[in-house]
Regions:
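Intrinsically disordered, low-complexity acidic Ser/Thr-rich regulatory segments
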Residues: 1-124, 129-134, 150-226, 287-292
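Short hydrophobic/aromatic patches on the structural cores and recognition surfaces of FHA
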Residues: 72, 124-130, 136-140, 144-148, ...
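Short alpha-helix capping/helix-loop boundary micro-motifs
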Residues: 148-152, 223, 264-266, 270-271
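Short acidic-glycine-tyrosine-enriched beta hairpin
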Residues: 154-162, 268-277
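Internal, well-ordered interaction modules that form the hydrophobic cores of assembly/scaffold domains
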Residues: 221, 229-234
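C-terminal functional regions that serve as terminal interaction/effector modules
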Residues: 258-267, 283-289
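C-terminal interaction modules of eukaryotic adaptor/scaffold proteins
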Residues: 274-292
């Protein structure tokens, strides 16, 4: 688990982190939040619809790390060698039957149908973790799977941003005097790589002392038109504030929300707030917080 911590921007040594979490849990009258994760909809079959997360981690996790980190991914195949923190071997016998499945993830995504994972999903896809510094839960994608995306209303874009709207993916590059947008259709993306030859490229020019508003949707009145019936007439918009020098991605037209939502890949640690909605692996989740 030590190699996971830097990916989550956690600087506390692993054993010290566990000790500090246990102190919070065991302290009399200690107040901390619990996170309930609800499966709203999915093409996969889950054993239950609500999962509870505490500062220790996912309740009833087979990994049982109690480190405040919940790793999301697929179940790994059996391993013959032992490894600390992710395999349990009965020390009283060397019987191979005592070697349990190699479980590296806490939240296990069901495999569709009867297909075998063939070792393709050995690494966690993303994580939810408890931050000891501000006592909040955060989510971070590891960029190893399909990806975790959060539903946004108004989002500050800094650097490059990957957006999903309807059946399209938008890669947004923020440069000094312009915003470059590469639009990939999902049907093309499934069979090809993110190459310029496979996308439609749009550009927004930025003027230092002038605000700008760019609408994106299927309406012919939008500044950037994408022909996709899954999109609203105005699906989202990009706003530039010349005073703050900030660039915002807004769902809908900035006032009225879109029908299917605007989604951003969670490439940076993001705080989970009440009613936080995200999707991953054909599953839509909503997070709710409650005080202990």
């Amino acid at each position: 688990m030590e190699d996971i911590l830097p990916l989550l921007n956690i600087n506390t040594p692993y054993k010290q982190r566990i000790s500090e979490i246990n102190t919070i849990i065991k302290k009399p009258n200690s107040k901390y939040s619990l996170l309930n994760l609800t499966v709203v909809s999915s093409t996969l079959k889950y054993p239950k619809s609500v999962y509870s997360i505490s500062p220790l981690g996912l309740q009833n996790s087979k990994r049982n790390g109690k480190d405040g980190i919940v790793l999301f991914g697929y179940e790994r195949k059996k391993e013959n060698s032992s490894s600390e923190n992710n395999i349990n071997i009965n020390s009283e016998t060397n019987d191979e039957s005592t070697v349990k499945d190699f479980l590296f993830n806490d939240f296990i995504f069901p495999i569709e149908g009867n297909e075998d994972n063939n070792g393709l999903y050995e690494s966690p896809n993303f994580a939810i973790y408890y931050n000891l510094e501000d006592n909040n839960y955060y989510i971070k994608d590891f960029n190893t799977g399909v990806g975790a995306l959060m539903k946004i209303k108004k989002y500050v874009m800094e650097g490059n941003t990957l957006i999903n709207i309807g059946g399209n993916y938008l890669v947004v590059y923020i440069e000094k005097n312009r915003i470059l947008i590469k639009i990939f259709n999902n049907s093309i993306l499934e069979n090809t790589q993110l190459k310029d030859s496979n996308c439609d490229i749009k550009q927004i020019n930025l003027e230092e002392n002038s605000n700008s508003y760019t609408s994106i949707g299927r309406s012919q009145h939008c500044d950037i038109i994408i022909e996709d019936m899954l999109l609203s007439k105005v699906q989202c918009c990009i706003e530039y504030n010349s005073k703050t020098k900030k660039i915002y991605l807004c769902d809908g037209d900035g006032k009225k929300e879109s029908t299917n939502g605007t989604w951003v890949f969670i490439l940076n640690p993001t705080k989970i707030t009440d009613n936080f909605m995200f999707k991953a692996e054909h599953t839509l989740f909503v997070a709710n917080l409650a005080m202990k």
